[in-house]
């Protein structure tokens, strides 16, 4: 279904943009908390004859943040690229504040008390700036790529491509700003390798889970919109 008819009036579009903006901020807040909770994945390569198993660390934030790419792609599909960009520009400064506040309040995934906000944390602020820049660059690139490809007949090409390039930009911008020549010696030395592994894992999760989720949600939305259009057409 090609969405060319004015299905939504201006008030409905404004309401949708407001709710989508809150959804973006919620996901950013949740991701800034869950990114502090790590887990380890071990691939038993020795069972296949390899000399060693392969292990890597990630965080639960890797699983929550792609919801923003899902929401952005659906926004471009339903409302268009212009409204998707509006949401990004509305959200980006609240996202900066939320990123800093959540990271300070829940340092190492433990509540530090509201008094922690009375002390400015430069290290955390740098991470918040990195999160801010990564969100803006990654989402704008996601909109550009998806908008260029959304008219293709093969539905999965647009979300897969936009998530691939958007996540790449998001990951590189975040790790380079947050940890390049960081006060943390380990992160300063290994940020590129850690970012690359993080990107591969996010890409895997995105393609396996979020691209199919995009297809399912889009089909549901299109059926609802088709019913709405049919009801409006005079008999």
Curated annotation (Swiss-Prot):
Keywords: Cell inner membrane, Cell membrane, Membrane, Transmembrane, Transmembrane helix, Transport. One of its GO terms (cellular component) is plasma membrane. Involved in the import of queuosine (Q) precursors, required for Q precursor salvage. Pfam families: Vut_1. One of its GO terms (biological process) is queuosine salvage. Signal peptide: none annotated. This is Probable queuosine precursor transporter. The keyword Cell inner membrane applies. It is found in: Cell inner membrane. Belongs to the vitamin uptake transporter (VUT/ECF) (TC 2.A.88) family. Q precursor transporter subfamily. The chain crosses the membrane at residues 17-37, 56-76, 87-107, 127-147, 155-175, 201-221. One of its GO terms (molecular function) is transmembrane transporter activity. The keyword Membrane applies. It comes from the Bacteria. It is a multi-pass membrane protein.
């Amino acid at each position: 279904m090609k969405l060319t008819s004015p299905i939504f009036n201006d008030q409905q579009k404004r309401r949708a943009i407001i709710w989508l903006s809150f959804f973006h901020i919620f996901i950013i807040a949740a991701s800034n908390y869950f990114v502090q909770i790590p887990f380890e994945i071990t691939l038993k390569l020795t069972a296949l004859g390899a000399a060693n198993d392969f292990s890597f660390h990630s965080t639960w934030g890797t699983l929550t943040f792609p919801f923003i790419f899902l929401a952005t792609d659906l926004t471009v599909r339903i409302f268009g690229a212009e409204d998707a960009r509006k949401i990004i520009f509305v959200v980006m400064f609240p996202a900066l504040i939320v990123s800093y506040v959540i990271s300070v309040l829940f340092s190492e995934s433990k509540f530090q008390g509201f008094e922690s906000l009375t002390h400015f944390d430069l290290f955390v602020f740098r991470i918040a700036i990195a999160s801010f820049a990564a969100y803006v660059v990654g989402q704008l690139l996601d909109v550009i790529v998806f908008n260029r490809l959304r008219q293709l007949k093969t539905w999965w090409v647009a979300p897969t491509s936009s998530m691939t390039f958007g996540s790449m930009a998001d990951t590189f911008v975040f790790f380079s700003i947050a940890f390049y020549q960081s006060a943390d010696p380990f992160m300063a030395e290994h940020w590129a390798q850690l970012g690359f592994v993080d990107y591969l894992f996010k890409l895997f999760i995105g393609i396996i889970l979020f691209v199919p989720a995009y297809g399912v949600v889009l089909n549901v939305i299109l059926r609802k919109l088709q019913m709405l259009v049919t009801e409006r057409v005079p008999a």
